[in-house]
Swiss-Prot record:
Recorded family membership: In the C-terminal section; belongs to the glutathionylspermidine synthase preATP-grasp family.
One example GO MF annotation: ATP binding
Species of the source: Crithidia fasciculata
The protein, known as: Glutathionylspermidine synthase
Binding site for ATP: R350, F351, D352, K544, K579, G586, Q653, K689, I690, T691
Cofactor: Mg(2+)
Binding sites annotated in the UniProt record for glutathione: R350, S369, E433, T501
Gene: GSP
Binding site for Mg(2+) 2: E364, N366
Keyword Ribonucleoprotein listed: no
Domain of life: Eukaryota
Positions bound to Mg(2+) 1: D352, E364
Catalyses which reaction(s): spermidine + glutathione + ATP = glutathionylspermidine + ADP + phosphate + H(+)
Keywords attached to this entry: ATP-binding, Ligase, Magnesium, Metal-binding, Nucleotide-binding
Length: 719
């Protein structure tokens, strides 16, 4: 660090005597926007500040840079860059390019709404005028002067009785103290005639009010895209008293009624209904802004890689072999899978992220599942209201809005959307499937679809002739038309059955000699007239067999563990696990100690699928290799899980040691994807190191403000 000169300008603008180096954090505003050091006022880096969500997380993404609009924030770390980033982060408003900071005062048509590009109006209040006083998020503008040769801009962060506090870049370079979340104070006075004046030795022109509300995170997360991640992030688990009568659930709502029925003892919904204590959450997780953004960007990035890996599998010269032997898709079904890849967009899924106290790492991608949807988008907010937890917002606040948007887009997709706009929601006889389906049906209906709930396979039958309500651009096929009990054509289905289950039933049906006159599960979901959500190609993307392909494309990704079909030297030289590619709910995961035998390490495969793919070679010969038998030592200090979903190939993966909270709990942070967009976070925790179907969903909050995590609470019932 170097000393600052002691002249009038520095003495009035700076608190300390030492500069924070260029590109390092000075402080964070009360509402969560970082201020970064430019080093000194004379420095012009000529380096571009890129919208945070566009920054690549691996070499794979650096090969195909983000091309979305509103990507360039300005020159690092000038005052204009900060104002542009602040407005984008807090209001989803974009400030167009400027030659100098002073132009903010005089140029017209400077601001647009990031969501739709519409102009945003402003009010300019000259200094020492009778206009409105400065308010939080206003832009203070200086003109050209000896110390501000290009003008200057800052953001009002707080208004006090006799001053305003502002945040700014390229004016003041000392680290902010913990209790001083602003750059400086500017004296303010009001004259007897009602004129408001900000007192500063530099030529202060006035303040600009951007007439747009703060961004509503119930509607989406667009504003999060612009937030810089400046630290590893923090997570707090705060215990709360358990209420076994689950009073936050509103039995006047169908979804809540079904959810309560699934929780209470013996399904008793009468007086005294209660759940077992072990079935009710007893805590909230609080995530700071850095952590939430890390999770969201990891999910978005890894989804792109998963899609690219799926394409890689389908394009491989030996794709027929790969699909059959590693993903369980028989050759006769593969044309239907490829058609679904071409026709039907992804709907949703969840990344399971592990956290070791520092790293956030993907464990797997459950993208053929909608479990914990209601709990994420609805229940955890109701719990927050019951407990009086107002800090932050639900980590699923915008999940419902994203689902509605997905269905709205689907409604305009002429390749997919049937003309009668009807979706059949097919589920098994299970409370969780029922309330999840009802929740999703509500989103589809908001978008304009009609819906029907179909429990098991009751009342489906075949009908002669082609469907009359097929999507306008659907390709005719020779598959039979299927109708429901009211003779309405089944042309779009949302399902809870996994594709593993569907394909298993398909194989069983083929090997059976029993005649079947009504449509079976596979007859419906493998019918080329019917578009399915999730589509059949999710049998690839949703399989754990995709993990080695993902790692092959982005081996340096900061949120991914090494994975392979072979016990490679890279994997077995550390703690590692094995798991079946189609295992679910944590079944048959085995944990192993590192292999220490020099002979075994020397004989372990060094090449894996990564090298084959990078050379555009067929992966078949590599995957068919027989690894040397290992003297695998099961990690006796940790847990393994018995059982299998179906017999399948194994994937080997490096192990992450999960952080234990409150000396007992191991959470998994599940990052939702809806379509191709991040949808929020839901947390599942267990006292076991392996998350299972029975693992508790625990409410979570994201705290975007710059405040300590957690709330004060006294157990006095609902507040």
């Amino acid at each position: 660090m170097s000393s600052l000169p002691h002249n009038h300008h520095y003495e009035t603008h700076h608190r300390g005597t030492a500069e924070v180096p260029f590109d390092e954090l000075i402080g964070v505003t009360p509402d969560g926007v970082p201020v970064i050091s430019n080093g000194n006022e004379a420095h012009f880096s000529n380096l571009e500040s890129i919208t945070a969500a566009c920054l690549p997380l691996s070499s794979f993404e650096r090969k195909a840079p983000c091309k979305q609009p509103y990507r360039k924030m300005g020159v690092k770390w000038q005052c204009v860059e900060f104002v542009r980033r602040y407005l984008a982060s807090r209001k989803a408003v974009w400030m167009t390019s400027l030659c100098t900071a002073e132009e903010v005062w005089r140029e017209e048509n400077l601001f647009v709404d990031v969501r739709d590009g519409r102009p945003v109006e402003v009010v300019r209040t000259p200094n020492k005028s009778t206009g409105p006083a400065p308010a939080v998020a206003d832009i203070v503008v200086w003109g050209e002067g000896p110390e501000t040769p290009f003008g200057h801009v800052a953001i009002v962060t707080e208004v006090c009785a006799s001053c305003v506090r502002v945040a700014e870049q390229n004016q003041g370079f000392e680290k902010w103290p913990e209790d001083v979340p602003f750059s400086r104070e500017i004296a303010m006075r009001t004259t007897e005639s009602g004129e408001v004046e900000l007192l500063d030795e530099d030529p202060l022109l006035g303040w600009v009010t951007v007439q747009a509300p703060f961004y509503n995170f119930d509607d989406g997360d667009l504003a999060d895209s612009f937030r810089l991640v400046v630290g590893q992030g923090q997570i707090l688990r705060q215990p709360f008293p358990k209420h076994v009568d689950v009073p936050w659930l509103n039995t006047g709502e169908e979804c809540d009624t079904i959810l309560k029925h699934s929780l209470v003892v013996d399904g008793n919904m009468g007086e005294g209904a209660h759940a077992e204590e072990g079935d009710v959450p007893g805590a909230f997780y609080f995530l700071d802004y850095d952590m939430f953004c890390r999770l969201g960007r990891a999910a978005s990035s890894l989804h792109r890689i998963a899609m690219a890996a799926t394409a890689k599998v389908l394009e491989d010269p030996e794709s027929t072999h790969l699909l059959e032997h590693y993903f369980g898709v028989p050759p006769e079904i593969q044309p239907l899978l490829r058609r679904s890849w071409e026709m039907t967009p992804p709907m949703g899924g969840r990344f399971d992220f592990g956290y070791d106290g520092k790293n956030v790492v993907m464990l797997e991608y459950n993208c053929d599942s909608s479990g914990a949807l209601l709990e994420c988008c609805n229940t955890q907010e109701k719990m927050a209201r019951f407990y009086g937890v107002s800090q932050g917002t639900s980590t699923g606040s915008f999940l419902g809005a994203k689902c509605v948007t997905y269905f709205q887009r689907l409604l305009t997709n002429e390749k997919v959307c049937p003309q009668h706009r009807l979706i059949h929601f097919m589920i098994d006889e299970d409370d969780e499937e029922r309330y999840t389906a009802r929740c999703m049906m509500g989103f589809a209906e908001q978008a304009g679809f009609r819906t029907k709930l179909c429990v098991k396979l009751v009342n489906f039958r075949y009908r002669d002739g082609p469907p009359s309500n097929a999507a306008p651009l659907a390709t005719p096929c020779d598959h039979p038309t299927i109708v429901d009990g009211e003779d309405e054509e089944v042309l779009m289905v949302w399902k809870t059955w996994s594709w593993d289950t569907v394909l298993h039933q398909y194989h069983s049906q083929r090997s059976s000699s029993d005649a079947v006159n009504t449509p079976t599960l596979s007859d419906i979901l493998l019918n080329n007239n019917i578009r399915v959500l999730e589509p059949l190609w999710k049998a690839v993307t949703g399989s754990k067999a995709i993990l080695p392909f993902m790692h092959a494309l982005a081996p340096d990704h900061e949120h991914m563990l090494a994975a392979s079909f072979l016990p490679t030297r890279e994997i077995i030289s550390r703690h590692y696990i094995s798991k079946p590619v189609n295992g679910r709910a944590g079944q048959n995961i085995m944990m192993y100690d590192p292999v220490t035998s020099p002979t075994e390490l020397e004989g372990a495969p060094q090449q894996d699928i990564c090298e084959a793919l990078s050379q555009n070679a067929s992966a078949r010969s590599l995957l068919n290799g027989s690894p040397l038998p290992l003297s695998q030592s099961v990690d006796q200090t940790n847990e393994c899980s018995p059982g299998k979903f179906f017999d399948s190939v194994l994937v080997y993966q490096q192990r992450l040691f999960l952080k234990k909270f409150d000396g007992k709990y191991f959470p998994i942070f599940c990052g939702w994807m809806v379509g191709d967009e991040f949808g929020g976070v839901v947390v599942r925790e267990d006292t076991s190191k392996i998350t299972k179907l029975s693992s508790m969903v625990v409410p979570a909050r994201v705290v975007r403000d710059n405040v300590p995590l957690g709330v004060s609470y006294s157990d006095e019932g609902e507040t």
